[in-house]
Amino acid sequence: IYGHMFRKFGEVDEYKPYFNYNGDYIPERSSHTFVKGFDQIAWLLNEIKVNPNSSRLILSNWDPKVSTKTPKEAVLPCCLTLLQFHVEELSESERKRWLDANYEGGGLKAIVDYCDTGVDVEDEYRKEEIQEHGFGNLLNHYSVPKAKLSSQLYQRSSDCTVAGGWNITQMCLLTHLIAQQSDLAVGDFVWTTGDIH
């Protein structure tokens, strides 16, 4: 249900068959209602690119129509209610740590590889370039993210023994995927629940 809510929030696809008083099905009096849903993931990815400092970077799973239906009509209302994202710039030292953790051989090897022109690792021009630009060219050369993506989950209800760990894992993975698609490093994940049992 979470994937459907993230990609097709509010979508309605209902067919109401019409039967006359004898119980005969009458197709021409039946009705079909379709309302296209809203793709929250596509919207979020675009919003991160055009407005990364927005406080509205939110995915919502809560649909009041679902929670008011009788148990026979509805599936269980979503436990993962709201996921909010926050983009924060990385300092140069944080970018260096990211390079060190993510470049095979570490950040020092990345510096040596970047400076190595094939002639001499001690090439003065390359050393001066790195010093002059404060590692900026080096970090950009290796596509080191300039910002990180953090997220906070508000979970309406959490059954820890059945799904709690799985729910947290799902949303952490989703945060990683969105960060990857947005060329961002991964920041913090904060979890809040209203009812834990």
Tell where the protein language model's regions lie, with residue ranges.
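Terminal, non-catalytic protein-protein interaction segments that mediate quaternary/complex assembly
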Residues: 1-197
